[in-house]
Amino acid sequence: FGNERATINFLDCNGTWEYRLPITMNGETIQLGTTGCYATICGEDMYIVSKKMNVSKPDVSDPTFVVCDAKTMKGKAVINSIKTAYGAADGRAFLPMPNLKKGYLSTTNGVYVISLEDYSVLSQIEGTGGYTNNQTGNMIYRDGKVYAVDQTCGLFIIDAVNDKLLKTINNEAEGSTYCSIVEAKDGSIWLT
């Protein structure tokens, strides 16, 4: 991973690239965080997650989470840092759940609940954070539950309505850690 600011690039249906699209908010260009690691579009919004250059300096402008209009690239919200005991949680991925008016932001300190109405940090999912050398990454939503891959703990299964950790499936017996999760067309869930 580099030390450059993250950028957004667009590939149109004709195969033409547009590089370093600016995101503007209140007449100013928003700088994304260092090393973009995830972006997703849901409805009209794009959610962009970036790592931080230095998690021990949470007040330095280095946004973890940026929301913009997916067509116009007009910024809607910026969360610079989610402060923790050691500085800041480093962003990994975002799962919007518009029917619940919230989304989950996975980080190096577990999973945080983000309001989709005002983009504030509502809470942290208890039991998902506080581990050394930890990172929670990709997540999927299905049947009222969120399945979140965690490098240290395995798979978190979270009640998405009540924001409660229901179960952790540990993968130590397999001799490795999970890295990602996907849902196939037939609805089956796969871990790698």
Walk through the language-model features, giving the residues of each.
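Repeated scaffold domains used in trafficking and secretory/extracellular systems
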Residues: 29-41, 83-100, 130-143, 174-187
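Short glycine/acidic-enriched loop and turn motifs that connect beta-strands
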Residues: 1-5, 52-59, 110-112, 153-154
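Short loop/turn segments that connect beta-strands within beta-propeller blades
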Residues: 12-15, 69-73, 115-120, 159-164
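WD40 beta-propeller blade core
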Residues: 9, 66, 112, 156-157
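Mid-chain, structured segments of secreted extracytoplasmic proteins
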Residues: 33-60
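A short beta-strand motif characteristic of beta-propeller blades
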Residues: 16-32, 37, 74-86, 120-131, ...
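An edge-strand/N-cap motif at the start of beta-rich repeat modules
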Residues: 1-16
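Conserved beta-propeller blade signature
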Residues: 1, 45-48, 102-105, 112, ...
